[in-house]
Amino acid sequence: PRAAEAFHQRYETPAGVDVMDGGTLGGWLLDEILSTRRMLVFDCCDFKEKPGTLKVLQKSDVKIWSSTKISPHQTGFNDLLASAAILGYELEDLAVVGIQPELLDDYGGSLSPLIRSRLDEAVELGAKFLEEWGVKLTPRPAGTKAAPLSFSVLELNEYEAGRPDAKEACRYGDERFLVRTAGHAVENPEETK
């Protein structure tokens, strides 16, 4: 979600072009795939490469029937594309701007300095694809801030400010999310302000 957030903060998109933080929504993203012609995805991907390696996968590079998951999420992106294909739908164009993370199992963890240092390049790679598809991007005016893609507490700076230090942080996820009882609804902190 950090690359999508950085992209959203840097560029305004025209009507009909949505920027969203898909996070780890898995199957919930199927409707998004089924309602779009072209899709640009930013994600960490296990390319089996050196950490920090940036790659762009285009439609023909993504093997939807592959059993190899390129994403650490429960329902992989390949699974979603396969589900769309079963329903008779195929994206016109697809580009995945992926980066090889240092750790794949640091759920809820911070971006490492190496990965953070590659965000600008990832954003520009994504912008290049959108422009090739005919999307006119407008840089946001200096000093303006885009509305959050999700709850503001999940934006990079606010999230990091609330994250426990390394001695207290659960390395298998962020305990702020793990302590919920199954079936317990997550309150929207924006509604309590």
Regions found by a protein language model. Name each.
Residues P1-E90, V96-I99, G109, P113-S117, ...:
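N-terminal catalytic or cofactor-binding beta/alpha core of small enzyme domains
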Residues G126:
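Hydrophobic "lid"/C-terminal helical patch
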